[in-house]
A protein has these predicted regions:
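Copper-binding active sites and cupredoxin-like electron-transfer domains
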Residues: 1-215
Length: 215
């Protein structure tokens, strides 16, 4: 399965290390590989890790984010902010924009992609705009039969989950946490750029977009 891990040195250092990014995921594949909901082999062409991180950055009296010479200097302030359970940022893979724009994840039409998503602290709701999850291994368990055709799936805090999707059309897809406040305002979003030929049998534009007229 896929599992979350995090630093746990003891006491208040546990949350401090975790909210400082000292966490991730590990994947252990079955000896015979993954199978779909019907028990047939399911092979992926690419696997991408989405490490979701909540950050709690302190601000000064003027509302600007504080800077510290070393991490331990900000420990007390960060822990105080974190007690409110309201993150200043929720990001993928370390920072806002880490997986968007020029840093977008890549793929091709016809490829199957496995997304591994972890969150050490908070619940998350992954969602692929323009697609969905063909298969979801709930709770990250590869020993269980995957569920199928999820629009949005769930990652409980302190766990990792895996989802697979076969891309059938080219274009830009957005993978995000479907708490849209966190996705749009706090940074929990990634881009997936898919190359290939458009398939009109899947979707066809019958009329070019134009102005909306009022009658």
């Amino acid at each position: 399965g896929v599992f979350v891990y995090h630093c746990a040195p003891g006491g208040t250092m546990i949350p401090f290390h975790t909210i400082s990014g000292m966490n991730g995921a590990i994947m252990i594949l079955p000896r015979k590989g993954l199978t779909d909901a019907k028990g047939k082999p399911w092979h992926y062409d690419r696997a991408y890790y989405i490490g979701e991180q909540d950050l709690y950055l302190p601000k000064d009296k003027d509302g600007k984010y504080k800077e510290y010479a070393q991490p331990l200097e900000g420990m007390a302030d960060m822990l105080e902010v974190s007690k409110g359970l309201v993150p200043s940022h929720v990001v993928f893979n370390g920072t806002a924009g880490a997986l968007t724009g020029d840093n977008a994840l890549k793929g091709k039409v016809g490829e199957k992609v496995l997304f591994i998503h972890s969150q050490a602290n908070r619940d998350s709701r992954p969602h692929l705009i323009g697609g969905h999850a063909d298969l979801v291994w709930q709770g990250g368990s590869f020993a269980d039969t995957p569920t199928t055709n999820y629009e949005t799936w769930f990652v409980p805090g302190g766990s990792a989950s895996a989802a697979g999707y076969e891309f059938v059309q080219p274009g830009l897809y957005v993978y995000l946490s479907h708490n849209l406040i966190e996705a749009v305002l706090l940074g929990a979003a990634a881009h997936m750029m898919i190359e290939g030929e458009w398939n009109n049998e899947v979707m066809e534009q019958t009329k070019a977009p134009g102005p909306i007229s009022k009658k």
